[in-house]
Amino acid sequence: MLRNRITSRRSISSSVSALANYGKPQNPAIDTTVKMRIQPIKREGETMEIKRARLIYQSRKRGILESDLLLSRFAKKYLNEFTEAELDEYDRLLDEPDWDIYYWATKNYDVTPLPDKWKDSKILKMLQEDAKNDDREILRMPELDLEQK
């Protein structure tokens, strides 16, 4: 009889505990995400021609098709007209994560808020205008103009 009473208390105790924790994860997940930002390479002594070529390459080879399309078309359209200061600003923009650039270009700020440092950016405003695609062109990667200087 005493043995049954002890067993009953144990089963009731474990049942109450199980009910209290019902639906809760038994082993809560531990966030093991490591967040780190790699600083961009500082390039010194780079000529305007080499910088333009590098920026064209970096605009075309982002790793995300959406960003590749937006940035490669933008680079084809404007890069040859940019001043050195505008090239530097575009270079800094390309140092940002791909999805951030895409969401900023498409003004999707609820997904990725626009940082203060980019709020007055002439280059980002130009990219946003280009991303609107008012002419409703089918977006394709522009051909490389290897003769371009």
Swiss-Prot record:
Any one GO cellular component localisation term in the record: mitochondrial matrix
Localization: Mitochondrion matrix
Chief location: mitochondrion
Listed transmembrane segments: none
UniProt xrefs under HAMAP family: SDHAF2 (MF_03057)
Function in brief: Plays an essential role in the assembly of succinate dehydrogenase (SDH), an enzyme complex (also referred to as respiratory complex II) that is a component of both the tricarboxylic acid (TCA) cycle and the mitochondrial electron transport chain, and which couples the oxidation of succinate to fumarate with the reduction of ubiquinone (coenzyme Q) to ubiquinol. Required for flavinylation (covalent attachment of FAD) of the flavoprotein subunit of the SDH catalytic dimer.
Protein name (database record): Succinate dehydrogenase assembly factor 2, mitochondrial
Organism listed in the record: Scheffersomyces stipitis (strain ATCC 58785 / CBS 6054 / NBRC 10063 / NRRL Y-11545)
